[in-house]
Amino acid sequence: MKVSLPAFEKARVLVVGDVMLDRYWVGPTGRISPEAPVPVVKINQVEDRPGGAANVALNIATLGGQVQLAGLVGQDDTAHALTLGVQTLGVEPQWLTIADKPTITKLRVLSRNQQLIRLDFEEAFDKADSVRLLKQSEALLDSVDVVVLSDYAKGAIDQPRDFIALARAKGVMVLVDPKGSDFGRYQGASLITPNMSEFEAVVGTVTSEADLLEKARGLLKQHNFDAILVTRSEKGMTLVTANAPELHIPTVAREVYDVTGAGDTVISALATSLAAGADLPQACAIANTAAGVVVGKLGTSTVSRIELIEALALHHGESGFGVVSEDQLAYALEQAKLRGERVVMTNGCFDILHAGHVSYLKQAKALGDRLIVAVNDDASVKRLKGDGRPVNQVDRRMAVLAGLASVDWVVPFSEDTPQRIITRLLPNLLVKGGDYKLEDIAGGAEVIAAGGQVQVLGFEDGFSTTAIIQNIMANQ
């Protein structure tokens, strides 16, 4: 399946669930304690990361989605640290503070990239606390497209059936990362995402692929779910729906360092993709790719849109050069700048590529290490040049440009001027051919404001696409 990313910035998601703080103490071990046969860790790094439902919300925000987060916290310093952690990425916390309970904290001691011990600081919340949280969250349903219930069995989500029913009645999809042996608590959910252990805790041991599908379809019918996505570690994922064939998605993980938070990443990528307009199979493929990225990181982590673009490109065997999308180019440009490469950018219609174009692009490339050529799509060429243009469709124009040794990346744009795409990419040097004044070059002011430069190059005399077309017409 060829996967493209939807406009994540359009996604509006509410996450409700068990929020917690993941705290890491990190340091070297060089000796065994004289008091007991345990290593002594000299702590030289302390790090706090939002975990549980808060990690789901951060993953959504990192992908570019708009997200609100509802959860139960204590009246303590940990709650303050958690608030700061989620607000850093623009997540709106909607806490319900329970004064006599601590904010859940998971403290991990690490050395040499290995977890030595985990210490949990928590007390289960009361059922009444969950009722109040879900009631408070009802007011947020009108402002979102998807709800995620992130259940870690800590008490935030006790009996959510009425909340799910209300959300579905409002046309809001409800995704659940479940816990426990009673999936009936999530009756009517749009999608649940158990891992294999969680799935078998409910349905019993799975003996074969056919058995998995039969048991999944039984759960769909029993609890009125629209779909079940079973995450299966090295076997990837299996999506089962009521009205379509099952979908098996193989894993794309290259290296596995830590599975902490992988389930959070799956449901956050699903929620963001679905809220942005992706269909369910596409959203599952995106989530599978995101999970493959996050297990290659240590500790509770997030996955960015740029990382997803890179992972999808690698999965599809793409080199990262040639004809690319804007998102692919944004990632490639970021990497080029990290390598210290000077990036030059130009633009045009390039309807019939001629020797003047080739010479101009060679000059442009000589001014830096990499050259981007932004190409007007067919509709914008017609608006600029009139009926009968372009002679060559944009895919063909870009393919020819990508074949030139001087050109590294070719990207289409649909506006009459390249102002928007230049402003997004901000090359080190923007060049334009002809007799332009610097102040009249689209995107030039933005490039200069970002510390870049703008330069005008001359075209070789005697070459013109219009003249070539007229000459062809005259000789017919």
Swiss-Prot record:
Gene3D superfamilies associated with the record: 3.40.1190.20, HUPs (3.40.50.620)
UniProt cross-references to InterPro entries, sorted A to Z: Bifunc_HldE, Carboh/pur_kinase_PfkB_CS, Cyt_trans-like, PfkB_dom, RfaE_dom_I, RfaE_dom_II, Ribokinase-like, Rossmann-like_a/b/a_fold
Pfam families for the chain: CTP_transf_like, PfkB
Residues holding ATP: N195, M196, S197, E198
GO MF term set: ATP binding; heptose 7-phosphate kinase activity; heptose-1-phosphate adenylyltransferase activity; phosphotransferase activity, alcohol group as acceptor
Keyword Cytoplasm attached: no
Annotated catalytic residues: D264
Region (Cytidylyltransferase): 345-476
GO biological process, one term: ADP-L-glycero-beta-D-manno-heptose biosynthetic process
Domain of life of the source: Bacteria
Record key words, sorted: ATP-binding, Carbohydrate metabolism, Kinase, Multifunctional enzyme, Nucleotide-binding, Nucleotidyltransferase, Transferase
Enzyme Commission designation: 2.7.1.167, 2.7.7.70
Catalytic activity: D-glycero-beta-D-manno-heptose 7-phosphate + ATP = D-glycero-beta-D-manno-heptose 1,7-bisphosphate + ADP + H(+); D-glycero-beta-D-manno-heptose 1-phosphate + ATP + H(+) = ADP-D-glycero-beta-D-manno-heptose + diphosphate
Biological or metabolic pathway of the protein: Nucleotide-sugar biosynthesis; ADP-L-glycero-beta-D-manno-heptose biosynthesis; ADP-L-glycero-beta-D-manno-heptose from D-glycero-beta-D-manno-heptose 7-phosphate: step 1/4; Nucleotide-sugar biosynthesis; ADP-L-glycero-beta-D-manno-heptose biosynthesis; ADP-L-glycero-beta-D-manno-heptose from D-glycero-beta-D-manno-heptose 7-phosphate: step 3/4
Any one GO cellular component localisation term in the record: cytosol
Location of region: Ribokinase: 1-319
Function: Catalyzes the ADP transfer from ATP to D-glycero-beta-D-manno-heptose 1-phosphate, yielding ADP-D-glycero-beta-D-manno-heptose.
UniProt subunit comment: Homodimer.
HAMAP family in the cross-refs: HldE
Family membership noted in the UniProt record: In the N-terminal section; belongs to the carbohydrate kinase PfkB family. In the C-terminal section; belongs to the cytidylyltransferase family.
Protein name in the entry: Bifunctional protein HldE
Higher taxonomy: Bacteria, Pseudomonadati, Pseudomonadota, Gammaproteobacteria, Alteromonadales
